[in-house]
Amino acid sequence: GKAKYVFYFIGDGMGVNQVNAAETYLGALQGRIGIEPLCFPSFPYSAFVNTQSATNGVTDSAAGGTALACGQKTKNGTLGMLKDLTTSITSIADWARNSGAAVGITTSVAIDHATPAAFYAHVKERHEQYTIGKQLVESGNDFYAGSDFTIPTDPEYPNGPTLYEEAKAKGFTIAR
């Protein structure tokens, strides 16, 4: 059958050591030796991934996010494109939306940060925040929740509409 809901949780930069440290700390808060388990390690499905980028032994959030979102490695700093910096690649969010599913992306950081942006953006450089925000508005996804756009105004047209205004015009409800 077809899944009714799919949730894809990413602990950006988080590994086994960070989870163990948090669980050990929670156990210590209760005055005991040992761990107090976090809830997510008991989810019915989980995976650990090793995400070297296409060009570096240590990935960054853009290349790592792209690998997680698109299943393809790219160079550090790049979102939603192959390392040739010309070929855009589709993400799991695109696949879901094109299959008729509603797609929402939530984050605890700026909505145009590299990890969430890997699911909707296609840019050569992760620091192209205005372009990333523009692609969010045009993505066709249904829902976004996060901390703000990093650069909401077009640097070339500072008196033009903001990304908030453009998102609202596309039917998004803006809560700030």
State where each predicted segment sits.
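N-terminal catalytic scaffold of extracellular/periplasmic and nuclease hydrolases
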Residues: G1-R176
